[in-house]
């Protein structure tokens, strides 16, 4: 960890409820007296939000897979410099809805086997992993149904369909095994409050152990 801060990320397929759980966790930790920054990727800083609009809206085929990975990495670098690292240096808890693990999955798998390229760019330009990653594991069909029910123009990932959702879920579970020291898997196929209770218990245990 940088300074005394804690860097937490939420990951999962679209429709898994991770964004809701990130928000609920932020509210719970703030109520307990923690100084929390709730952020997201792509985005989380003015420059990164501009890149978000480029990659999530409009025709995805206007970028090659390699160009898209560069855009996501550029957004993450700006987010890291302007939001995440200053907050961690100040001792704050940073909760991020998606981080590099999502790029490893969506760009690394969905547009060809580019995982090695994603990891090389990450090592060169980002150089850090979260302290704790909460994977909200969800049945892919249920997640896709939820995601399709959302309104808005950022439909990029939801357009991938059920087959890719299955691959993404399997890929996230593989990542959880690869980075077992920082991943915690949470069953997202339950009501929101039950999931939130598990999230809170895991995070408070981690905070108590590291502070």
UniProtKB/Swiss-Prot annotation:
Cellular compartments per GO CC: cytosol
GO molecular function list: ATP binding; dTMP kinase activity
Alphabetical keyword list: ATP-binding, Kinase, Nucleotide biosynthesis, Nucleotide-binding, Transferase
NCBIfam families linked: DTMP_kinase
Protein family (similarity comment): Belongs to the thymidylate kinase family.
Xref: CDD domains: TMPK
Domain of life: Bacteria
Record EC number: 2.7.4.9
Coiled-coil blocks: none
Catalytic activity, reaction form: dTMP + ATP = dTDP + ADP
One Pfam family here: Thymidylate_kin
Lineage of source species: Bacteria, Pseudomonadati, Pseudomonadota, Alphaproteobacteria, Rhodobacterales
Residues that, per the record, bind ATP: 12-19
The protein's name in its UniProt record: Thymidylate kinase
């Amino acid at each position: 960890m940088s300074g005394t801060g804690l860097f937490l990320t939420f990951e999962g397929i679209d429709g898994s409820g991770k964004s809701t759980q990130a928000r609920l966790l932020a509210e719970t930790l703030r109520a307990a007296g923690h100084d929390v920054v709730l952020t997201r990727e792509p985005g989380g800083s003015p420059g990164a939000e501009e890149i978000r609009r480029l990659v999530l809206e409009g025709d995805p085929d206007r970028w090659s897979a390699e160009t898209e990975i560069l855009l996501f990495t550029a957004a993450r670098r700006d987010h890291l410099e302007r939001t995440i690292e200053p907050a961690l240096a100040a001792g704050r808890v940073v909760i991020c809805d998606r981080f590099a693990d999502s790029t490893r999955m969506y760009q690394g798998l969905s547009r060809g086997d580019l995982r090695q390229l994603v990891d090389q760019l990450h090592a060169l330009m980002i150089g850090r992993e979260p302290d704790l990653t909460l994977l909200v594991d969800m049945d892919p069909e249920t997640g896709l149904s939820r995601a399709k029910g959302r309104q808005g123009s950022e439909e990029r990932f939801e357009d991938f369909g059920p087959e890719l959702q299955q691959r993404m879920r399997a890929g996230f579970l593989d990542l959880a095994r690869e980075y077992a020291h920082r991943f915690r898997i949470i069953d997202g196929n339950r009501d929101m409050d039950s999931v939130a209770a598990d999230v809170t218990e895991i995070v408070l245990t981690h905070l108590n152990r590291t502070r």
